[in-house]
């Protein structure tokens, strides 16, 4: 990749940012030398790594690689059998600890970096041994070996003895007058006392040092010379034992040189990958879609070196209908920034970095990128001359091909406008004919006309607000830039007569061209305003639609709650009424009743039902849409569903005039409008024989037994249908004093049998029930015995 272009497009400023996110020195060095790649497979692999690292950061946060020390020199020494010092062994422990932390922190998942994580070798035994033996760079643990512990214990005892002897001298009345100070000190590793110089002959011992004034001598008392010698001997033994411990640890580390080296390389690579992910997160960048077709389609691209609160995103595309894009517009209007944005984002993408643009932005892979940009807008370089521009251009024309991207800033500038425009058109046309993807900025109208009249070339402009005299930095592809010199001059107060004189001096063709461009600009602005209004209306409609939908959902929820509560209340009332009716039937069967007594009980039941009905204070629930039935469709014995109560029953009477039918629900009988009924099946209950009173006895005799079967067949019914039919059948059978009945429900999935069993448990007048035995129908029937 062209190094000059990397510098011109400020790629190294991106790598400087990238380096700041790396933790270890090895990763920083690699990232500082990062260069764009030209193989799309390698690029996509690096982008996959960045993407997967970013995903892991979002899920579990980042991890610290700062303990990844460069152990390559230490490993090389281990390979030849050398012993490592304390610092080197601590670095190896740090590498192993970091490997374990990274491996444990990021759980297993299949992605582009999972293989690296799996290949990390933690070598726990070695790491534990190093940590056990070494406390810090200055201290070896007593637990490193039993011999070291013994030596240090002896050394401690010797220290205590020597301090005891010295303290005796300090407290001795004889020697106190000889001492300059009452402290114990060390000189040359030996314990001494500070003695006044004039008493040196009176204080037996060895002189090791004196004060700067010479008034104090540091004398090792004769009484502790042997003890000092003992301590010195123990110190030498301690040092020798430490060397043995370090040699032993080094030997153990030497058994894992390949794992240690592999861990270091993997951790450095992971640090690089996670640094790229951190940069992407900081820039709010996204993954580009790479291609080898020369297509660039950047959506809302932002120059990464411009402050996020000031940068204006641009949409820019080329490589499909055209490969040469001419950008025109005022100075400081964003033309050069547009060039640099395309060039820099391409370099970033080819380096495996995410780009500050919207998702699914397309970036082409180029073999080389050439940038001839007059760096008048860079504080680091001075204005280029025409000669230097032309030198760059000659080099570009020699080297560029269809796999390259060429960026020209103010092509043909710095010389006579007529000659400069002609040269620029010739250069651009040559690159177009060779299929080179090219972007160029210019002020020349001739180049705008060339773009308008040449296939495969497109105009673009940087928008300028004449009212505020400020560029908007928006890039508009398909519209050539308009020279705003006259409008700006008038806005700034230049007299009209000068403007008029200048207009007359313009070439007629130039005036016509500028008028066309001006008309296009006005049409574009008008269209954008209309489009903005349409988008505003669409957003308002969407908002209203969302609010209406939310309101309807709340209303539906409220309605459902009302219906649910009403159904619960109705079910409770029905249960209350049925329980009362059951008790009445039980009493009637037990004692027998006169017709008058029966009528009295019937009146009591009706009064209780009326009271229960009064409790229902909710509005009738809205009935869900269903097929409307005509009164002629209803037959006695037909099974129906009462939609307002969500219960099933049997038609016992029909009232055509009122379009109502009487529905029997268990022991409860009530009139219902047919609009609130749904026919469930054409099933008809067997006709019941009319009850007759026994001859003058005044007792009710149940002669229904002649019309009540000892068996009910529920095959083909749903659970709800079966329970409704079973409820009425059992009432009739109990009243008819049939001692035992047989319920046929089949085996099937068991749902119907379970529903029947659950219902039977709540019937008060049932003595017992069981599944059929062999010969009775087995598990396909249930036998019920009444009380």
From Swiss-Prot:
SMART domains: MUTSac, MUTSd, SMR. Disulfide bonds: none annotated. GO terms for molecular function: ATP binding; ATP hydrolysis activity; ATP-dependent DNA damage sensor activity; endonuclease activity; mismatched DNA binding; ribosomal large subunit binding; rRNA binding. ATP binds at residues 329-336. Belongs to the DNA mismatch repair MutS family. MutS2 subfamily. The keyword ATP-binding applies. Residues 712-787 form the Smr domain. Its EC number is 3.1.-.-, 3.6.4.-. This is Endonuclease MutS2. It is an enzyme of class 3 (hydrolase). GO terms for biological process: mismatch repair; negative regulation of DNA recombination; rescue of stalled ribosome. Homodimer. Binds to stalled ribosomes, contacting rRNA. The keyword Repressor does not apply. Keywords: ATP-binding, DNA-binding, Endonuclease, Hydrolase, Nuclease, Nucleotide-binding, RNA-binding, rRNA-binding. Endonuclease that is involved in the suppression of homologous recombination and thus may have a key role in the control of bacterial genetic diversity. Acts as a ribosome collision sensor, splitting the ribosome into its 2 subunits. Detects stalled/collided 70S ribosomes which it binds and splits by an ATP-hydrolysis driven conformational change. Acts upstream of the ribosome quality control system (RQC), a ribosome-associated complex that mediates the extraction of incompletely synthesized nascent chains from stalled ribosomes and their subsequent degradation. Probably generates substrates for RQC.
